[in-house]
Amino acid sequence: RLESWAASPTDGDRLDCRATITVGGHDHALSARATGQLGALSAMLYDLGAGVEIHRLHQRHDGADVITILLCGNDDRQWWAVGTGADGDEANRNALIAGANLVPH
């Protein structure tokens, strides 16, 4: 579960991102620098052992909400994950967390 998220611009086109992610009842404070929020969150998830590859990304608007649909993968498996949010970045983060929750253990 993504408990908190913050992103701030840094050098070049990169972002410094900080998150608190709960896994198995334990909170993990993580940070990553990347060219976008999805890249940063992906790096954090790999650090937690829940790496997810994004094979496809689709977005739709539903009224004021944005819906992101991801085709995720890990090794030779693939699955779909969905997230919603007030903007594209929030919907992307929620979809990626949903995909990470489906990583086979």
Task: Describe each model-derived feature in a short phrase.
Residues 1-82:
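Terminal or standalone catalytic/regulatory effector modules within metabolic enzymes
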Residues 72-105:
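Mixed-charge, glycine-accented linear interaction segment located at domain edges/termini
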